[in-house]
């Protein structure tokens, strides 16, 4: 294997991606991409700040304190305390994924990985980083992270093999964003991307019991990407062949039967991967959203109410059924990965927002009654990325059917600016004071004009919370 014919280091995909990261400036970004980046940064920071009160975040923070790691200069969002930049990336990344509020369609959850790494890197940049520079770094992070997943043949084959792509692909995006913030040169950035392979990992075993480590995948990826950039800045080397079709390479290891190596560089600088990322309107796995939306759409179109429903049949592909067809409602993580619970919560409480997933809501007797009306038909003819067909039969015998190919929040069916800001204020308001929520929203919405992101945004994230009660998950 050591005798394989190798591509010269400066001609590898890793090297070309590094040069792309270094040479790209804000002026290279289409206006629509820059504006979309502002929305996703707002959404990601909102998710991470809300996640400050998640049980996973609390346990992780307590663990770091117990290990003597409880001090530093980088803010833990919404917690009023600071740790080292590396530990802040770990905690804030974990918090960003803790409530299933984070965006999706990137590496899968690019925002929960890239944004915490980029914010933490501000503490180590040694200079003020403008909003335009920060946006550029984040866009590049989303781009590299998604390219990693597409090089595996896209979401379905890689995740279907048992790998959680947020953890396997995310570190490369975090490394790219951090390298850009830190001002690394092309050689250092190439090494950072290679080093990030050491932090690539994460399995879907958590789907079977709702284990908390799914949340850790985002935090570990954020921390690993930042560490990769810092190591490269100090002269540590990473394998240049990481993205080549060689033994031990990323594609060869994680996608031996589905690899698409050309995806690393395909339409580089033309097809910005942020463009395909979705913002979540519901606090559950994205694979549950089309079923929620389908029922909502049928109710809106035909005017029936939840208590008129006799049965809901969901015709679904085997991949999504295996991931989200379960009926466990405890712990909360399991409920958020359950189509039956998510649809039932939407029907019983009027939405599948975070408030619909508390322990009290999950134990509402109406939930069990409604979930009992939902059944599945697994259709092996459907492709892994096909959205389900939803059939609703009413007690009076009427039946309706629909399929939502692009759930709410997708680029072609986006949430409005008003809805996005409402979500932000709702979830961040669980932690910060109304004045701090307003200040943070104002800074983030005007991020393009900000001259020093650390001073004007990170400072607010480090303020003491107005509410400290841990979310009852």
Segments (PLM) and residue ranges:
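Short, well-structured alpha-helical segments that form the helix of a local strand-helix-strand
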Residues: 138, 142, 190-193, 438-442
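Hydrophobic alpha-helical hairpins/lids featuring a short glycine-rich hinge
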Residues: 92-153
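Flexible glycine/proline-rich, aromatic-decorated loop/lid segments
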Residues: 195-203
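Terminal-appendage/accessory-domain detector
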Residues: 1-110, 206-208, 213-473
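Active-site cavity-forming subdomains of large catalytic enzyme subunits
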Residues: 126-133, 150-162, 172-192, 205-215, ...
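Well-ordered alpha-helical segments within folded domains of soluble proteins
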Residues: 111-120, 170-177, 223-227, 288-290
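Active-site histidine-anchored catalytic micro-motif
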Residues: 165
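Short polybasic/polar patches that bind polyanions
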Residues: 123, 180, 300
């Amino acid at each position: 294997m050591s005798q394989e014919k190798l591509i010269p280091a400066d001609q590898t995909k890793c090297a070309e991606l590094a040069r792309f990261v270094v040479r790209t400036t804000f002026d290279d970004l289409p206006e629509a991409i820059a504006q979309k980046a502002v929305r996703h940064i707002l959404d990601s920071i909102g998710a991470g700040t809300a996640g400050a009160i998640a049980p996973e975040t609390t346990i992780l923070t307590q663990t770091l304190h117990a290990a003597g790691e409880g001090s530093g200069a980088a803010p833990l969002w919404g917690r009023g305390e600071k740790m080292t930049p590396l530990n802040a990336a770990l905690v804030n990344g974990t918090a960003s994924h803790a409530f299933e509020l984070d965006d999706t369609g990137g590496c899968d959850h690019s925002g929960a990985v890239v944004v915490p790494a980029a914010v933490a890197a501000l503490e180590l940049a040694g200079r003020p980083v403008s909003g335009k520079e920060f946006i550029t770094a984040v866009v590049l992070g989303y781009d590299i992270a998604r390219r990693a997943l597409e090089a595996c043949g896209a979401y379905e084959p890689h995740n279907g093999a048992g790998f959680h792509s947020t953890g396997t692909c995310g570190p490369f995006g975090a490394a790219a964003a951090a390298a850009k913030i830190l001002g690394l040169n092309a050689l250092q950035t190439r090494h950072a991307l290679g080093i990030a392979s050491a932090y690539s990992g994460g399995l879907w075993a958590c789907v079977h019991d709702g284990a908390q480590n799914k949340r850790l995948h985002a935090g570990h990826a954020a921390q690993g990407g930042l560490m990769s950039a810092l190591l490269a800045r100090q002269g540590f080397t990473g394998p240049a062949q990481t993205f080549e079709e060689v033994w031990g390479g990323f594609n060869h290891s994680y996608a031996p039967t589905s690899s698409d190596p050309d995806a690393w560089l395909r339409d580089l600088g033309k097809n910005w991967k942020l463009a395909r990322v979705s913002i979540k309107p519901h606090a559950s796995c994205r694979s549950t959203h089309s079923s929620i939306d389908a029922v909502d759409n049928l109710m809106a179109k035909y005017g029936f109410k939840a208590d008129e429903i006799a049965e809901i049949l969901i015709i679904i592909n085997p991949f999504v059924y295996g991931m989200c067809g379960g009926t466990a409602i405890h712990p909360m993580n399991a409920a958020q990965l359950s189509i039956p619970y998510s649809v039932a919560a939407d029907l019983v409480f009027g939405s599948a927002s975070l408030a619909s997933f508390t322990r009290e809501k999950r134990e509402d007797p109406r939930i069990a009654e409604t979930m009992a009306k939902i059944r599945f038909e697994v259709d092996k003819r459907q492709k892994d990325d096909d959205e389900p067909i939803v059939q609703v039969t009413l007690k009076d015998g009427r039946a309706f059917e629909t399929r939502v190919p692009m759930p709410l929040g997708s680029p072609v069916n986006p949430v409005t600016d008003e809805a996005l800001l409402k979500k932000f204020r709702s979830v961040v308001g669980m932690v910060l004071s109304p004045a701090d929520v307003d200040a943070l929203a104002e800074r983030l919405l005007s991020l393009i004009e900000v001259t020093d992101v650390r001073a004007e945004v990170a400072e607010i994230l480090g303020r003491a919370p107005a509410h400290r009660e841990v979310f009852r998950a």
